[in-house]
């Protein structure tokens, strides 16, 4: 699915931005950051459909109707799913990735139960994740090993590990903690 011009404009409105201010902007990390932050403060992570025993659809037109038209939120699969369509419609290169959460996983190998996006911009590759629903990056992270990235009073970095491949860490309470891992496959 690709969003048409009207749908793109509606998406911008839903996240509190004026499409005309961005329609000629180059497809770079600066634009990604503005879009991601606007999305994070405008569209909530929510699981009301699960609590109400309603089926969740990952069909793009259904996601658009739920999140943009009906002003709802969603889970990571929904929010990042619609974001993938939106970013691709703007012209970004986007790849859907599965990931594993480490929070509350204990010593077990966490299941792949989270969706995030790898986005190709003109100035590099970024990780976009607007569907965590708890302490997490508010802006896309540059996909670069060991690069410490500060945002909104929080500190993150990505490291490569043999078993998990890419691992996202946050610096919290004087230590680096794993948040999630993903591969680029």
Model-derived features with residue positions:
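Secondary-structure boundary elements
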Residues: 2-71
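His-Asp-centered catalytic microenvironments across diverse enzyme cores
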Residues: 3-14, 19, 43-44, 100-185
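Context-gated lysine
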Residues: 23-26, 34, 54, 66, ...
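Residue-level marker of positions within ordered structural domains that often coincide
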Residues: 40, 81, 122
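Short glycine-rich, polar/acidic loop-and-turn segments at beta strand-coil junctions
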Residues: 49, 81, 98-100, 132
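Short active-site-adjacent helix-start/loop capping segments
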Residues: 53-56, 85, 104-106
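N-terminal start-of-chain detector that recognizes signal peptides
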Residues: 66-67, 87-93, 128-129, 140-141
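Cysteine-centered nucleophilic/redox motifs
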Residues: 72-98, 117
